Amino acid sequence: ITMSAGDVVRENHPIVFVEERDDLEGGEATDGTESADPDLIRPDLQETLDRHALTLDENRPEAVAKRNARGYRMPRENIDQLVDEGSFQEYWPLIVAQQHTRHDINTLRKNTPADGVIAGTASVNGELFDDEMSRAMIVSYDYTVLAGTQGHRGHYKQDRLYELAGRFKLPLILFSEGGGGRPGDDDTGPYVAADTHTFTQFSQLSGLVPLVGVNHGRCFAGNTALLACCDIIIASEDSTIAMGGPAMIEGGGLGVYTPEEVGPMSFQVPNGVVDILVKNEEETVEVAKKYLSYFQGNLQEWEAPDQRTLRHVVPENRVR
């Protein structure tokens, strides 16, 4: 090594010289794999497995119980219903909320898995279409993580995924439940204000790939901005959808309202905001899956009623 701390690096100046040797202390070089136990799980691998396990529902009993108490499902349950079994490849699951000045890392790993955004690629309707046509991108906000709010790292994740969706022309299904921008993240690590392109990139997908918006529960502010860019909005009867949530309304001096009073379906469906209203969360996924199939190609097998009966729909005598 030719350099020391504080030295100026000049162009074409060698920094490190590497000498190639044929042996190690007179013995034969080996990578150690010949004698390694293939079933052994090293501590570093075990740590990785444990970290991934923290993101799964079976290891989040409190969040699951709280969600089920409201009659709602976990985001991963919706994804499991939507995609073909075993096909979901999650992107960046080990990130946590950028709140390191407020919480220790173990607390963040327990309470803010994936920074509240579960996302990745999967196969949808693979039993009907080939591998290429069944590929899709799934992005689901997780309301059990800080009310589904949008954090810095969740934005970085979405920036990457929306870029990939555009590059590979993947249809995108968005589960939008959440409270919009998150005010509690800190500036730990590299960070520049407004350095993400989530909203721009998502809106640029409009007209390029099918955008399917699905909502159950409360959807406000930034989450609503993404939902509004979708080609179709499928919502359950328990949904409330609005650009400004109760806190923003109260802060603006416009009164105090509960979340259920802001953008209920009794208002948004007649308004034309919601395209398809369904009864519950499970049905939103069923409809989204069926809607997506309309853009995935032609069915190899299908059936239809006898069309000849239509010949007799119009009466021969128009005045009878």
Q: Could you tell me what each predicted segment is?
A:
Residues R21, G27-R135, S140-L146, F267, ...:
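Intrinsically disordered, low-complexity segments enriched in small/flexible residues
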Residues V139-A165, L170, D231-I233, S239-E260:
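Extended active-site and interfacial segments that coordinate phosphate-rich ligands
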Residues D7, H13-V16:
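Structural motif
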Residues I1-D7:
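Short histidine-centered loop motifs in beta-beta connectors
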